[in-house]
Amino acid sequence: MMKKRASHHLVICTLIDTLRFRLSSRKAISMNAFNKLVKHSKKISNFNHLSSIVGWDQAAVMPSGGAEARSQAMAELSVHIHGLMTQPQLADWFAEAESETLNIEQQATLREMKRQWQQATVLPEALVEAQSLAGSKCEHAWRSQRKNNDWAGFEKNWAEVVKLSQEEAQIRAEATGKTPYDAMLELYEPGTTTEQLNRVFSDVKTWLPSLIDVVIEKQSSESFIAPKGHYPAESQKALGLDVMKLLQFDFNHGRLDESVHPFCGGVPSDVRITTRYNESEFVQSLMGIVHETGHARYEQGLPKHLAGTPAGEARSMGIHESQSLFFEMQVGRSPAFIAHLAELAGKHFSAMNDPVFRVENIQKLYTRVQKDFIRVDADELTYPAHVILRFEIERDLMNGKIKHTDVPELWDQKMQAYLGLSTKGNDQNGCMQDIHWTDGSFGYFPSYTLGAMYAAQFMAAMKKTVDVDGAIRRGDLSPIFAWLSENIWSKGSLFSTDELVKQATGERLNPEYFKNHLKSRYLD
């Protein structure tokens, strides 16, 4: 997950910046309106820099006793940023800037600044503060409540988060003429609608369940050796760091830590990624690091000359997830990359002769399909079912068709329908398992499967000009990263998602690439 603090109001604020404006000093200012807005953007970006690092600290290293004071501090900061974001003079600056002569890059920067400003100005300051407080409280308590399967305790805090999120969704819907859920989607996937997602996901539901069953049956006759023993966290971290080096992560501008829920946070110049270790196996944490490194490389590769402005940020969360899933699924699970993982793992665990670390065995471990409860541990094939379930619930929750108290039962029903599993009485492995909803990140989940689809499409396009398998076998992935940099990373948010994908691949999102990728990997 890319940790865009789902206090989206804060994230949204992230993009524009402040200028203490006094009418009496107008004549002393020589900058045109566009440059004022850019300066404004960079100043608020600095505040959000601090907010992002503090958010990482809260998730990774803050002692439990610091939660209440931290919540107050974060709420104060979010209110401050929101106030800067909604200063009255910004409307005049936008009006003036639109009449100025701007180049294509400047026009895109202005467009994105205005879009983010419009999203921020619809929310009253009191709501922003209330959401920050409720989200911090709910998220912190969730960390222990999930462990204890304490739905009753979680529900008391979550009720307020949902109420405030529904209020936000309604305000945004009235301002934009969208449905409440579409208005929330716009925060993560600009231009994407529920209608589009319903169409894409409905198609997936026609072929995914049967494909899952066919692959599980096919793999039932295949033998593999599951990791058994003790894999020290220190050794797992050292292994992860070596893999990050292979993926050319810039350690001068980032680091790896631990947290309850893996994420990528920080800022492009200081990217913080986390994972979690289970000393009885190493498979999940290792590929989790590969996933978060994909997020991090995207952040580190964003256009530096646009830093501090919306145009210099990631295009959408779907594109962000496409990069993490490109690393994890397209590259990370390829036979050539698995060969590197097998060698490195055998070295770090001093078990080069252990059959667990044979290339073919590691390959089977990373392409094993099974129906499971946990999204973050799900395999590539069953993962979309987890996403579709969440999409359908949060869509109906934000549109007021269901109540938050309905969620556990609905979750159980959908898990049984899509994966044949029941979560009745097991909410810690059901509706309480994700961090997203604890602070109101409704609308984020579709980004994961959209990202998987974009990633498959990017790989298909890349292979037309790049010897991908050869680069991975050689252990020099530079040609792969050069393609991503040229076609995705360096373009930030200069183009719409549709246009970005079309420029890179020759067409807009085409889910057939994802379907073909899955069939090729798991049936051929």
Q: Whereabouts are the PLM-identified features?
A:
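Short, Lys/Arg-enriched N-terminal segments with co-localized hydrophobic residues
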Residues: T18-S30
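Contiguous, non-catalytic segments that form substrate-binding/exosite surfaces or channel walls
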Residues: Q131-F282
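C-terminal, non-catalytic "cap/extension" segments appended to globular domains
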Residues: A33, S52-G55, G65, A69, ...
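Polybasic, lysine-rich low-complexity intrinsically disordered segments
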Residues: K3-K4
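A well-structured
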Residues: S30-P190, K519-L523
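Active-site recognition of the HExxH zinc-binding catalytic motif
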Residues: Q284-Q300, E321-L325
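Post-HExxH zinc-binding segment in Zn-dependent metallohydrolases
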Residues: E313-N353
